[in-house]
């Protein structure tokens, strides 16, 4: 009888240990995925309309930029201080380039007109006081809704260092009727 009780107690202990290890493994894998693979990001505001809208839920891909550099027109996610929030913007200017926005809204890269059709609303220089030369690891970003976007045209945001780019907006989770990969080309 005592042997049966000991076996039952040992079996319950093994089951508890097994469950604890399983939960720990799930938590560890979840942490690693969120830390290194992807994170959920919510669109706050209308700066990326019509591409993204307020309340859209996205998955940010954190892996791609370990294997290649960001490209022009990628939609990137980066933190914005002093508030602890993320900005979602489109890359317009690449490292080493000169970006200029004329009063008529034309965007120039190294003196050449940038051919793009993402801009919504009027593109104005805002706080830019002439051409902006990007450093070796800096990007110039704009929101698609140019009239309301707080982006690289403003001192508060400025040029974005490569080191703070978390990843690229990759997948729209919500709203469900718009679920799918975000194409940026």
Residue ranges and their predicted role:
Residues 51, 69, 92, 100-101, ...:
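Extracellular/periplasmic catalytic domains that process cell-envelope and extracellular macromolecules
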Residues 109-126:
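PP2C/PPM family metal-dependent serine/threonine protein phosphatase catalytic domain
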Residues 56, 71-75, 97, 138, ...:
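Structural motif
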Residues 1-86, 160-164, 168-185:
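Protein maturation boundaries and topogenic segments
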Residues 128, 133-185:
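Beta-strand-rich cores of mature extracytoplasmic or soluble domains
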Residues 63, 81, 104, 112, ...:
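Short, surface-exposed secondary-structure boundary micro-motifs
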């Amino acid at each position: 009888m005592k042997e049966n009780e000991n076996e039952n107690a040992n079996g319950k202990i093994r089951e508890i240990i097994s469950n604890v290890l399983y939960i720990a493994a799930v938590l560890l894998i979840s942490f690693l995925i969120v830390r290194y693979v992807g994170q959920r990001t919510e669109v706050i505001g209308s700066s990326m309309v019509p591409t993204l809208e307020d309340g859209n839920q996205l998955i940010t891909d954190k892996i791609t930029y370990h294997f290649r550099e960001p490209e022009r027109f990628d939609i990137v996610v980066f933190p914005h201080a002093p508030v602890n929030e993320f900005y979602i913007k489109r890359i317009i200017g690449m490292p080493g380039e000169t970006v200029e926005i004329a009063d008529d809204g034309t965007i120039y890269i190294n003196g050449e007109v940038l051919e793009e059709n993402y801009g919504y609303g009027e593109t104005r220089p805002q706080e830019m006081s002439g051409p902006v030369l990007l450093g070796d690891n800096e990007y110039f970003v704009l929101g698609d809704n140019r009239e309301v976007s707080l982006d690289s045209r403003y001192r508060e945001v400025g040029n974005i260092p490569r080191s703070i780019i978390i990843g690229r907006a990759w997948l729209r989770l919500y709203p469900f009727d718009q679920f799918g990969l975000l194409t940026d080309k």
